[in-house]
């Protein structure tokens, strides 16, 4: 029997890096709403009292970047200078240029199906049947903890909470099956007038217990709630934030490989984002079809070229049909050319701001989380639903 521990972390929407991600994606959404064919690469930097938005944007749309920035920060919850950051008074600087025409000539084509990739690169998608959303449990529950922190902060259950928070969950596995939670870490920014004792009790009762399944908690589970003893200074006052610095939080919590490209602020012509979404869609449908218990997809591209340079399927010995068969099925059922995957997942819509906190995967509102190809994959592989005990 192989026993091991695996840990993943998440951060809240008020974490400085996530503020930056959300601003970048809010700008992207505002542009796509007017101009679905826009080329957007929007980067954001936040620090005490200021936000800088930069990058390359080519579009026919006009958007009010300052107001988008302030509204995003306002919705996150930084509305008072006592928190160290205030949507109403922070400076907003803009440094936006246009996308290079050298890139444009490689991407744009008269025949949309021949649209080239916006850059070279490699992307991964992953799925596992260990949770109902076909995601690894450590990252799934790390996300749910900080989502719950935001919920009880915003609805007034714990009004002394502040927007910045981090979570970390360690699961124990035996033979790749979950047997319990070994450790939970939750650090949350708070008002100065709350005691450590009251904070720890409230976080346990209102955040941790409602989120983590009781059957996974046991007397040996360790809890670390604000282990430094104080977290008053947080958000951009505590640390600067940058778009694209939480790529493992955004994906699979380290349980799967990562190609290195960030997502937020990029329009779907950037395969760093769109192909990673498509790879998740492929992997999730393979697992949903019962063709494997775990599946990782790698896809790669050359700039200006439509066809992927490679497609790889890894199932970690859990496959019910050969990986060669799975690779053929992927090529048959999924169009992974840039234009094809944009159409397949209907990506030219303003859906991206909501992806920028609490994970891009495992949340059913996003089109790449659909399992609408599972039945066709199963039938093509010659497997019946009953045979898979599904």
UniProtKB/Swiss-Prot annotation:
State the UniProt keywords alphabetically.
ATP-binding, Cytoplasm, Magnesium, Metal-binding, Nucleotide-binding, One-carbon metabolism, Potassium, Transferase
List locations, semicolon-separated. Cytoplasm
Pathway field of the UniProt record reads: Amino-acid biosynthesis; S-adenosyl-L-methionine biosynthesis; S-adenosyl-L-methionine from L-methionine: step 1/1
- Please give the catalytic activity noted in the UniProt record: L-methionine + ATP + H2O = S-adenosyl-L-methionine + phosphate + diphosphate
Q: Name one GO molecular function term.
A: magnesium ion binding
Q: Which note does the record give on the cofactor? A: Binds 2 divalent ions per subunit.
Q: Which InterPro entries match?
A: ADOMET_SYNTHASE_CS, S-AdoMet_synt_C, S-AdoMet_synt_central, S-AdoMet_synt_N, S-AdoMet_synthetase, S-AdoMet_synthetase_sfam
The cross-references to Pfam families, in alphabetical order and at most eight, read:
S-AdoMet_synt_C, S-AdoMet_synt_M, S-AdoMet_synt_N
Q: Which GO terms describe its cellular component?
A: cytoplasm
Mind telling me which PANTHER family this protein's record contains? S-ADENOSYLMETHIONINE SYNTHETASE
Q: What does this protein do?
A: Catalyzes the formation of S-adenosylmethionine (AdoMet) from methionine and ATP. The overall synthetic reaction is composed of two sequential steps, AdoMet formation and the subsequent tripolyphosphate hydrolysis which occurs prior to release of AdoMet from the enzyme.
Subunit relationships: Homotetramer; dimer of dimers.
> So what family is this one in?
Belongs to the AdoMet synthase family.
Specify the protein name: S-adenosylmethionine synthase
Q: Which organism is it from?
A: Photorhabdus laumondii subsp. laumondii (strain DSM 15139 / CIP 105565 / TT01)
